[in-house]
Swiss-Prot record:
Annotated PANTHER family: NON-CANONICAL PURINE NTP PHOSPHATASE_PRRC1 DOMAIN-CONTAINING PROTEIN, PTHR34699
Catalytic activity, as annotated: XTP + H2O = XDP + phosphate + H(+); ITP + H2O = IDP + phosphate + H(+)
Keyword Transferase tagged: no
Organism name: Photorhabdus laumondii subsp. laumondii (strain DSM 15139 / CIP 105565 / TT01)
Free-text cofactor note: Binds 1 divalent metal cation per subunit; can use either Mg(2+) or Mn(2+).
UniProt protein name: Inosine/xanthosine triphosphatase
Amino acid sequence: MYHVIAATTNPAKIKAISLAFDDVFGPGTYRIEDINVDSSVPQQPIGNTETRTGARQRVMAARQVRPEADFWVGVEAGIEDDMTFAWMVVEYQQIRGESRSASLMLPEKILDGIREGRELGHEMAYLTGIDNINQKEGAIGFFTDGILTRTSVYHQALILALVPVHHEIYKELNAR
């Protein structure tokens, strides 16, 4: 059974990790341990580079805390221009897979708060009245009326981040 470290305590992100591992490796083949680690970037990362760095740093920190695990997974959400998105980083042994999620264009009212230094989750909770919306459906779920959720969008990106770990062609290339 794989020991998977989720470098997050956010239930929406943990659910996405679980769904991706179910799809790629099968239910019952892993156990997820969530841990709280620092991303070494601001609470609300701005830009592609800062957000990707946050996901990578989470994995690096998780490996230091739980070096005996099989997988380490970092998920970092960020803002670029007028959109929210996230980076997924998965490491297994010396193999790393990365993927960026789909993006959602945010309304100016939300962006104004972010420009003033507040987090997207805070702005969404204020706008919607939903406490901890960032740990539930997120902005994605709210603005798509539940057609997509934070979990469903991250689930897809996590499957893509797992490709270098499980696909035979990648394994052959990594063995060379």
